[in-house]
Amino acid sequence: MLILALQHVLAMFGATILVPILVNEIAGCEVLTIPVALFTSGLGTLIYILCTKGKSPVYLGSSFAFISPIAYAYLAGGKSGVGLGIFAVGLIYVIVAILIKIFGHDWIHKLIPPVVIGPMIMVIGLGLAPTAISEIGINGGDLNLKYLIVAIVSFIVTAITATRAKGFLKIIPFLIGIVSGYVLSIILGLVDFTSIQKESYFSIPKFILPFKDYALSLKGILTIAPIALVTIAEHLGDHMALSTIIKKDLIKDPGLDKTLLGDGIATSVAGLLGGPANTTYGENTSVVGMTKVASVKVIGLAAIIAIIISFFGKIIGVLATIPSPVLGGISLLLYGFIAVNGLKVIVQNQIDFDDVKNVIVVSTMLVLGLGGAIISIITKNTNIQISGMSLAAIIGIILNLILSNTKKETNK
């Protein structure tokens, strides 16, 4: 079970640490730290497992949807603005969870039906594709042959293991692919061990203690909190995708109210401790899908490992030495798998594309989500930037509500 859990840790590690790195780059200073991001990721996952009574094999990691809002919230209201804004996001999740508990979840299904969820999941996966391409180094710049070789080997080893291996090896294809790519990277001289030397053996993450270090920042809250409406849709989409994979309706059992409650409390706790907002991780969902191991115990152990790692700088340093082409090769499979799950939602719900309304909703979401569309809402107090998946989700929901079906048959 330990090896299975390590596979999930490696799957989430790159994206989880990338969020604080990107936020800090945009803000021009340290807003978030990697150890706190790892700690709140693991703690948040355990909170989620507790709230869902151990019935949903979901891992929570740092959300990409909040990268720009967090950076702008920091510029508007400092770390207090960031922390309280993320706390407010979690609070919105909890409120929606309570409403679902009282009134049921039919209303949210009408608001966000499969015709919206399917392309939303596709945008999540395909929207991450440029990251994988960039990690490999085949995005139009000077080609590094060593990078390309490492990425190809990592990809092929993972794909062959997933499709041809037998027994225990078949359920750890990503771990085998990463190890193979890492060893080859060492042989080719692509691994830089200086990051390990710089890290201390043991250090306590730089937490921001609840209610002690905070000052009320309305600007920060208004910059971050509105994104919750988008990530709730992402939450629903991810759980529908996982339901398809494990052949169990997670929306009914443990229930959308419990999954949102777990995600919400986890996000609020992350905000109060100085971590990024949490979200259900498609990378780990892909691992579940390809390995066919949907064990909550494995996810829980991965969360505990993430918490432990956050206190040991040397371990973080070792994981940070994994070259980008290794992660890029693996990500080709991970992100593609996410996109295909979106397609499966459309197919399994028998979305009728003879109905022009459905064509308009899906096509508009795909173009906006993958076309680099960005809308900035700038006022005296806020600077909200909506782009990619977030923008596609909002427009998809609006179009689905205002357009009429052109055929008598409705989507299932």
Labelled PLM ranges:
Residues 1-4, 193-208, 244-251, 258-259, ...:
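Intrinsically disordered, low-complexity non-transmembrane regions of multi-pass membrane transporters
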Residues 1-58, 65-78:
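N-terminal signal-anchor module of multipass membrane proteins
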Residues 3-15, 145-155, 172-173, 188, ...:
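Hydrophobic, membrane-embedded alpha-helices of multi-pass small-molecule transporters
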Residues 16-20, 154-164, 172, 183, ...:
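Juxtamembrane interface elements at the cytosolic ends of transmembrane helices
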Residues 24-47, 225-296:
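Membrane-embedded helical hairpins/re-entrant loop segments and their flanking transmembrane helices
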Residues 31-35, 54-66, 108-117, 170-175, ...:
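Short, non-helical or kinked segments that cap or interrupt transmembrane helices
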Residues 69-75, 162, 284-299, 305-310:
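Interfacial segments of multi-pass membrane proteins
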Residues 76-192, 303-412:
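Membrane-embedded alpha-helical modules
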